[in-house]
C-alpha cells in the first residue's frame, strides 16, 4: 500500500474530460445496444488509460477521472438507502446555461449500505506504486444536506425529518460508515467536494436568505456541523481534504463572492487536513481570508482555470502564490487547477490536449516555486 499523502506541491482536483470511446459506450448503453457488462469493460479500459496519463504527466495523486459517474455529486448520493433519483428534465441555472441534472430526493431515512463507489476505488487502487497514491473524490456531507433542503425537495424531506438537525444527524452517521468502508478498502486519501460554501458567499446569498427569513449564520453553522459530524471517529492515518468552489459546469459558474464571510467557519473550524480552493479569477476575491485557516491545514491554491483553454502567464501565477504567502506560510501552500476538467459528463469547453497542457503548467510552476 502506498504511504504517500495528499496534497502534493502540484496537484489536481479529480475529474477529467471523458474520452470519446467512453461517451460512445454510455450512449450505446442508454440506447440498449450494449450490456452493462460491456459498458463496464470500456469504462475499466478508460480508467486504466487516464491513470497511465496522470503518471506520464508526473503527478503523484491518481484518480479514476470520475469516469464512472454522470455528476460529481449526485451519483454518490444515490448509493445511500432512502435516496432516489429520476430524469425530470429539470436543472440548475448557472451563468448563462442551464445545468441538466437529475432530480435527487428522499424516499426514506438516510442510511449507509455497501456503497458502490468503494468498489470503484478498489479498481483504482491497483494502480498505486511507489510514486503514486489513489485519491477518491466524493461530495461533502454538506452537499447532500443542501440537496435535500433545496426548495423543490424540502416538502418531501419533511415527510421523514421534522427538523434539519435530525437530517444532519443521519447524514453524518451515514458518511461515517462509508468513510470506514473506504478505509477498509485501503483508501488513505479522501477528498470531499463542497460547493455549499461557495453558494453562500457574497451579498446576493445573504439577501436571498434574508428574504426567506433565514439567518445565514445559522446556515453556515449547519454546514459546518454536518461536515464535522461525518469526520468524527475517522481513522488517524486517513487524509481527508475538502475542495471548495462556486460551481463548474460546461465552463460556466454558479455563484460569485469572496471567502471572507465563510472563513471563520470552514477555514478555521472544519476538521479536514487541507483545503483545495478556487482562486482562478476575481470572483473568488483576495487572499486575506487565508489568515483564518487553522495551522493544522494545508491550502492548495486553484490558480489555473479549467474553464478556459488559454494558458495562464507563469510569472503572474507565481506572483499570486507569493501574494498568498503574506497570509499563510509557503510551506503550507500547494498549486492546482481551480476545479476538475469535467465535474459532469459534459465536461468543460477545452480539449484533452489543453487539459494536459494546464497540468503541465501547474507542475512547471510548482517545481520552480518550491524547488
What are these regions (language model features)?
Residues 1-371:
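Domain-level signal for soluble alpha/beta catalytic cores
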Amino acid at each position: 500500500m502506498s504511504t504517500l499523502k495528499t496534497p502534493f506541491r502540484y496537484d489536481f482536483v479529480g475529474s477529467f474530460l471523458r474520452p470519446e470511446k467512453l461517451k460512445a459506450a454510455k450512449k450505446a448503453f442508454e440506447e440498449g445496444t450494449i450490456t452493462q457488462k460491456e459498458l463496464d469493460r470500456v469504462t475499466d479500459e478508460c480508467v486504466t488509460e487516464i491513470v497511465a496519463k496522470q503518471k506520464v504527466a508526473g503527478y503523484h495523486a491518481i484518480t479514476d477521472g470520475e469516469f464512472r459517474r454522470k455528476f460529481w455529486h449526485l451519483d454518490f448520493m444515490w448509493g445511500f438507502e432512502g435516496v432516489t433519483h429520476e430524469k425530470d428534465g429539470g436543472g440548475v441555472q448557472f451563468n448563462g446555461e442551464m445545468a441538466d441534472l437529475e432530480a435527487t430526493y428522499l424516499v426514506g431515512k438516510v442510511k449507509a449500505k455497501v456503497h458502490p463507489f468503494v468498489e470503484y476505488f478498489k479498481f483504482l487502487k491497483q494502480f498505486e506504486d511507489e510514486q503514486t497514491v489513489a485519491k477518491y473524490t466524493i461530495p461533502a456531507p454538506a452537499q447532500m444536506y443542501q440537496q435535500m433542503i433545496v426548495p423543490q425537495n424540502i416538502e418531501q424531506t419533511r415527510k421523514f425529518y421534522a427538523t434539519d438537525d435530525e437530517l444532519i444527524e443521519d447524514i453524518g452517521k451515514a458518511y461515517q460508515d462509508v468513510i470506514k468502508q473506504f478505509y477498509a478498502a485501503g483508501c488513505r486519501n479522501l477528498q470531499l467536494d463542497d460547493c455549499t460554501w461557495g453558494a453562500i458567499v457574497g451579498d446576493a446569498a445573504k439577501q436571498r436568505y434574508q428574504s426567506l427569513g433565514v439567518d445565514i449564520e445559522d446556515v453556515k453553522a449547519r454546514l459546518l456541523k454536518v461536515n464535522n459530524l461525518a469526520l468524527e471517529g475517522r481513522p488517524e492515518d486517513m487524509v481527508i481534504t475538502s475542495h471548495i468552489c462556486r460551481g463548474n459546469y460546461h465552463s460556466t459558474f454558479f455563484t460569485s463572492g469572496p471567502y471572507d464571510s465563510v472563513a471563520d467557519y470552514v477555514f478555521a473550524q472544519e476538521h479536514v487536513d487541507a483545503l483545495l480552493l478556487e482562486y482562478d479569477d476575481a470572483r473568488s476575491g483576495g487572499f486575506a481570508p487565508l489568515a483564518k485557516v487553522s495551522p493544522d491545514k494545508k491550502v492548495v491554491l486553484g490558480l489555473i482555470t479549467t474553464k478556459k483553454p488559454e494558458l495562464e502567464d507563469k510569472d503572474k501565477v507565481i506572483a499570486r502564490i507569493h501574494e498568498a504567502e503574506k497570509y499563510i506560510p509557503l510551506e503550507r501552500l500547494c498549486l492546482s487547477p481551480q476545479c476538475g476538467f469535467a465535474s459532469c459528463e459534459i465536461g468543460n469547453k477545452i480539449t484533452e490536449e489543453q487539459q494536459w497542457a494546464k497540468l503541465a503548467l501547474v507542475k512547471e510552476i510548482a517545481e520552480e516555486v518550491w524547488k
